[in-house]
Amino acid sequence: MHCPFCRHPDSRVIDSRETDEGQAIRRRRSCPECGRRFTTVETAVLAVVKRSGVTEPFSREKVISGVRRACQGRQVDDDALNLLAQQVEDSVRAAGSPEIPSHDVGLAILGPLRELDEVAYLRFASVYRSFSSADDFAREIEALRAHRNLSAHS
C-alpha cells in the first residue's frame, strides 16, 4: 500500500482489528521511508446484479432512498432507516456470496420493513412485487395480518 504522505510504494502493518461488526478490517500502518503512520479500512466488495445483468456495488444509501420513498408521510426517522439498511446489508452478506441478485436485496428489505411500518411495507411490496390490482393488495394485507397474529402468539 502506498504511503499517503510520501507515496512510498510499501508500508508495514502494525496492528489489525475487525470493525463494523466484523464487516471490515482496520489496519494501522507505518511507512518505512518517512516513518509516518496511517490507517486503512478494508471491506469486501459486495456486488448487486441487476436484472439487466449489470453489476454495481451494494449501497446502503440506495436501500435507504428506496425505503424512504415508501415511508413518505410516515413517522419513520433516519435512525430507523439506517438500522434497516444495516440489517439488509448484514442479511445479504450472510449469504456468503460476493454477488447477489437485486431481487434478493428486495427480499431482504421486506422483512425488516414489515416490522418497522406496515403501511411503508405495503407501499414497497406493491412496487417490488408489481401489484396490478386491488386483489393483490388484499392478499398482501391478509398475509400481513396472519404474520401479525403469528407474532402476537409466539
From Swiss-Prot:
Write the record's keywords in alphabetical order, separated by commas: ATP-binding, DNA-binding, Metal-binding, Nucleotide-binding, Repressor, Transcription, Transcription regulation, Zinc, Zinc-finger
Q: Which residues form the ATP-cone domain?
A: 46-136
* Pfam families attached to this UniProt entry: ATP-cone (PF03477), Zn_ribbon_NrdR (PF22811)
Name the needed cofactors: Zn(2+)
**What GO molecular functions are on record for this protein?**
ATP binding; double-stranded DNA binding; zinc ion binding
Disulfide linkage: none
Q: According to the lineage, what is the superkingdom? A: Bacteria
Q: Which GO terms describe its biological process?
A: negative regulation of DNA-templated transcription
InterPro entries assigned to the protein according to its UniProt record, in alphabetical order: ATP-cone_dom (IPR005144), NrdR-like_N (IPR055173), RNR_NrdR-like (IPR003796)
Note the zinc finger regions (unnamed) by start and end residue.
3-34
Return the GO cellular component terms, semicolon-separated: cytosol
The cofactor binding remark recorded in the entry reads: Binds 1 zinc ion.
In terms of PANTHER family, this protein maps to: TRANSCRIPTIONAL REPRESSOR NRDR
What does this protein's UniProt record list under function?
A: Negatively regulates transcription of bacterial ribonucleotide reductase nrd genes and operons by binding to NrdR-boxes.
Recorded family membership: Belongs to the NrdR family.
For this protein, the record's NCBIfam families field holds: transcriptional regulator NrdR
On assembly, the entry states: Co-immunoprecipitates with DarG in the presence and absence of darT.
Designated name of the protein: Transcriptional repressor NrdR
